[in-house]
Amino acid sequence: LLYIAGLRISEVCDHTMGDFYWRRGADGKERWWLAVRGKGEKDRSIPATDELVLELMRYRSANGLPPLPREGDPLPLLLPLIGGAKPMGRSAVHELIKNVFRETATRLRALGPDHEATAAHVEKASAHWMRHTAGTHQSDNMDLKAVRDNLGHANIATTSIYIHTEDDKRHDQTSKEHKLGWMHP
């Protein structure tokens, strides 16, 4: 949810399985969506991709639930680790995510010293890092307005911070094409 849907940690904690819904598009195709009330109490609908729906089905089935949620399903998006239906709080989810990254870093280090830099990078990761990565990857291949709407940004300038590859391409192109001509190769 943090990466595939680009949700904020608060949005993961504050929403339920019943916030997933489907509707038929103008082309007749059924599409799943996730209704989110985000920052500033702004409502948005996030496309629930086929990949997200498949992972949701696997997650629910592994937890003894029917594969797809129903309208009004009160269960939290992230099921509590120790039974019950009470949603996990932000700090608990944050700590859970940090633990996953720490464990991943430990496993990377066990592969040998060649993996130390990657392990150190992963160890610093957080829930927001996953959202930021989602925004960056979406902005590489999608219209910036769609990325803005998916992430729930009020201003496209906020979404622009995720554009790295365009800046890299612009830098490379400028370096190649805009020269004084004084330097010799």
Protein language model features and the residues they cover:
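Catalytic-site neighborhood detector that most strongly recognizes the C-terminal catalytic loop/helix
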Residues: 151, 155-176
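Short, charged phosphate-coordinating catalytic segments
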Residues: 2-28
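Short pre-functional
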Residues: 1-10, 33-34, 136-137, 178
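Residue-level marker of regulatory loop/turn positions in helix-turn-helix DNA-binding domains and
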Residues: 1, 37, 89, 119, ...
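C-terminal catalytic core of Y-nucleophile DNA break-rejoin enzymes
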Residues: 38-58, 73-99
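Short, basic (Lys/Arg/His-rich) helix/loop patches that form interaction surfaces
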Residues: 94-149
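C-terminal secondary-structure termini that scaffold catalytic or DNA-interacting sites
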Residues: 177-185
